[in-house]
Amino acid sequence: MRRSAATAVALALLSALFFTATYVLNRAMASAGGHWAWSAALRYLLTLPLLAVVMPWQGGFAPVWRALRAHPFVWLAWSGIGFTLFCICLTWAAAFAPAWLVAGTFQLTVIAGMLLAPLLYRDERARLPRRALALGGVIVVGVAIMQGNHFHGRLDADAWWALGAVTLAAFLYPLGNRAILLHLERSGEDLNATQRVFGMTLASQPFWWLVAAYAGHVAGTPAPMQVLLAAGVALAAGTIATILFFQATGMVRNDPAALGAVEAMQAAELLFSTALGTAFLGETAPRGFAAAGAVLVVIGIVGLGLLVGRDSAGNRRATRALRSDRGA
C-alpha cells in the first residue's frame, strides 16, 4: 500500500506540472499578442481529438453518446458554463497578470466548490464544513495579499477586471462540473471521469466554433505559434494531466491519508507556474508580501487537500465529486 500511495502522489505531482501549462502557455500566447478568443477556442477544439484517441482505453464512446442523446440540452448548458465561460474568463485574464498570479488566484476554486454546495445539493453534501471553510479563508487571504502586493496596493481597472475574471472562472468550473455529475446521479447514467470530460468537451464544441468565428472576425487567422501553444495546453492540461490525476485518485481512493496527499499536490501548480514563468517568460517571481501570500495559498490548499481526502476516502460519491473538479 505504501508503494501504491507513493506512486499515486508522484502521479499527482506530475499531473500538477502538466496542469500548469494552462497558466504558463496562456500567458505566453497573450504576451506574444495572440488574441484570447483564439487561445481559448483552439484549446478545446484540439482537446477533443486528443481525448478521442485515449477514449477506447477509458471506457469507450458508447456510454457518452447515449448520455448526450438522452439529455442534450443539459450537457450543452452545463458544458457551456463549466468549460466555455470558464476558459474564456481564465484565458482573457492572462493578458493582465503573470502566470503565477493567475494560478494562485484560481486556487479560489477549492472554496468556490464548497460555497456552491448548498445551491446544488439537497442532502448532506449541502452542509458547509467549518474546518474546510477556515482553510478556504486562508487561501482567500493569501490571494488578496498576492494581488494587492503585485499591483502595489492600487488595482487599476484592468487589474480589477482580471481579478474578477479569474474569480468568476473559479466558480464557473466547479459549478459546471458538479452540475453534470449531479445530473448523472439523478439519471442513473454511469460515466467515469474521463468520459465526463470528453462528453463536456464534445458538448461545448458549438460554443467553441462561435468563439473561433468571433476570433477570426476580430483578429484574423491565428499565428502558427499560437496554434502550437494552444495544442500544448490541450495535450498537457486537457489530456495528460487529466488522465494522470484520475489514475492517482483511483489508486488510493480508499486510503484517507494518501488521497489527501494526492489532492494536496494541487498546491504545486502555484510553485510550478512561478518557476516556469520566471524561467521561460521572464516574469518576476513573487517577493515580499506577494511571496507570503503565495505561501498562505499553498498552506491552505495542502491543508484542505488532506482534510478533503481524509473525508472522501472510501466514499465513492465524494471521491467522484473531488475528481470532477479537475481535468480542464
Q: What feature does the model see in each segment?
A:
Residues L51, P118, L128-H150, R287-V308:
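Hydrophobic transmembrane alpha-helices of multi-pass small-molecule transport proteins
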Residues M1-L42, A134-A144, H152-E185, A203-V211, ...:
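Glycine-/small-residue-enriched transmembrane alpha-helix faces in small-molecule transporters
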Residues M29, S39, R43, A93-A94, ...:
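Hydrophobic/aromatic residues within transmembrane alpha-helices
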Residues A16, L42, V102-L108, L184-A203, ...:
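Helix-helix packing/entry segments at the starts of transmembrane helices
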Residues A32-L85, A112-L116, L168-A179, R196-G216, ...:
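Transmembrane alpha-helices of multi-pass small-molecule transport proteins
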Residues T109-A134, V252-R253, A258-A261, A268-A291:
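C-terminal transmembrane-helix exit sites in multi-pass transporters
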Residues A8-L13, L68-W78, A126-V140, D190-G199, ...:
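Cytoplasmic-side transmembrane-helix entry/capping segments in multi-pass membrane proteins
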Residues F18-A21, G59-F106, I145, A236-R253:
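Specific transmembrane alpha-helical segments of multi-pass solute transporters/efflux pumps
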